[in-house]
Amino acid sequence: MVELDSGWAVDQAIVREEEKVVVVRFGRPAHPDCLRMDAVLSKAAPRLRLYACIYTVDLDAVPDFNDMYELHDTDVATMFFFRNRHIQVDVGTGNNNKIDWAMDDTQDFVDIAEVVYRGARKGKGLVVAPSTDYARRRY
């Protein structure tokens, strides 16, 4: 995983990637939820290397996107982009813009990333996660 340290670097990562999904984890690196999500992402990265690039962004060091993506009251949020387009993911929580909790299961994340890739390649801006019981497991 590559850490992006400026708004410009985040924009360039999203704009320049033509073939893969860009996964951006916004968060506060010292927070326990962020650490859990980073562990899932680092385990998933080798399995996703052919169709996804994973980046991390410190919300406090790079506040440029806090308003745009409504990241004010979250400690971790994961978003997906493809060819400079934000891909929304319906995981059953009502908020399709981002996954705003730490996932515990690497396979769940891999499954979501695969669905995002397949849907984005077909031109879809909103994809439905393979399982929508994430909201139940979250609470």
Model-identified regions with their sequence ranges:
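Intrinsically disordered, low-complexity regions enriched in proline, serine, glycine
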Residues: 22-25, 34-36, 51-57, 65-68, ...
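Acidic, Ser/Thr-rich intrinsically disordered and amphipathic helical segments
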Residues: 9, 36-43, 64, 77, ...
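Thiol-based oxidoreductase modules, predominantly thioredoxin-like and allied folds used
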Residues: 3-6, 26-28, 42-66, 73-75
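Short active-site neighborhood of thiol/selenol oxidoreductases, capturing the structured segment around
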Residues: 17-29
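N-terminal "domain-start" segment that seeds a small globular fold
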Residues: 1-13
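Short amphipathic alpha-helices and their capping/turn residues within compact interaction modules
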Residues: 9, 15-19, 42, 46-53, ...
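Conserved beta-strand elements of beta-rich interaction domains across eukaryotes
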Residues: 9, 28-31, 59-62, 83-86, ...
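Non-catalytic, surface beta->alpha helical segment in thiol-disulfide oxidoreductase systems
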Residues: 73-74, 80-131
